[in-house]
From Swiss-Prot:
The gene is pdxJ. Its EC number is 2.6.99.2. Keywords: Cytoplasm, Pyridoxine biosynthesis, Transferase. 1-deoxy-D-xylulose 5-phosphate binds at residues 14-15, 50, 55, 105. It comes from Pseudomonas syringae pv. tomato (strain ATCC BAA-871 / DC3000). This is Pyridoxine 5'-phosphate synthase.
Length: 246
């Protein structure tokens, strides 16, 4: 895993699968969405195989691994079931995330500092089969430093607090928190990605932070695609972040 010379867009297609699973149909197909996203300029495709299988299914992951032209960023919880599945399919990139059954979406970052031994064992286990691991964490120096200690080459900073901020003061504070996290992560020698809650009206400020390698965005893209089409939604987002990062 190397730092990109330009900002990258990772497209999360989980909510294409959410729409499919709502009726238990074969459509819309998240694999087709992934291929359309690649054609529109996505640099990678992110999928989260949750314990409850509420959206992405194992079959989706297997198909994506075979057909993607870019790369798959496989999000998973730190469980024996998911570690065994990862060992079976050997994705090139894995992001370890926290997961609880009741949450609507991932609500916070992984507590690496509070469970270093467990996370370190998972990172080492995945590294042995050639997987490059990132950790989805809050933009907190304690968590970033712990991520470095457990051997992860990359982190993804949770931007949810920034996305949920209500007042201009709160927005500025949370944006600065992310920027400080990026700077600290880079100083630790980590590759720093970011994502969660980003959309067309708040992404530019994050994309403009120097040193961010990749932004992972999903829900906003799928929502916008209902009105403009998936390729157009991805192309618009890619143009926004590239322009902001210049």
């Amino acid at each position: 895993m190397t730092q990109s010379t330009r900002i990258l867009l990772g497209v999360n297609i989980d909510h294409v699968a959410t729409l499919r699973q709502a009726r238990g149909t074969r459509y819309p197909d998240p694999v087709k969405a992934a291929l359309d996203a690649e054609e529109a300029g996505a640099d990678g495709i992110t999928v989260h195989l949750r314990e409850d299988r509420r959206h992405i299914q194992e079959r989706d992951v297997l198909l994506l691994k075979d057909v993607l032209q870019t790369r798959m960023n496989f999000e998973m919880g730190v469980t024996e079931e998911m570690l065994a599945f990862a060992e079976r399919i050997r994705p090139a990139h894995i992001c370890l995330v926290p997961e609880t059954r009741q949450e609507l979406t991932t609500e916070g970052g992984l507590d690496v500092a509070g469970q270093e031994a467990r996370i370190k064992a998972a990172v080492e286990r995945l590294a042995k089969i050639g997987c490059e691991v990132s950790l989805f964490i809050d933009a907190d120096e304690r968590q970033i430093a712990a991520s470095k200690r457990v051997g992860a080459p990359a982190v993804e900073l949770h931007t949810g607090r920034y996305a949920d901020a209500q007042t201009p003061t709160e927005v500025a504070e949370e944006l600065q928190r992310v920027a400080d996290g990026v700077a600290f992560g880079l100083a630790q020698g980590l590759i720093v990605n970011a994502g969660h809650g980003l959309h067309y009206h708040n992404v530019e400020a994050v994309a403009a932070i120097k040193g961010i390698n990749e932004l992972n965005i999903g829900h906003a893209l799928v929502a916008h695609a209902l009105f403009v089409g998936f390729k157009a939604a991805v192309a618009e987002m890619k143009a926004l972040i590239v322009a902001a990062a210049r």
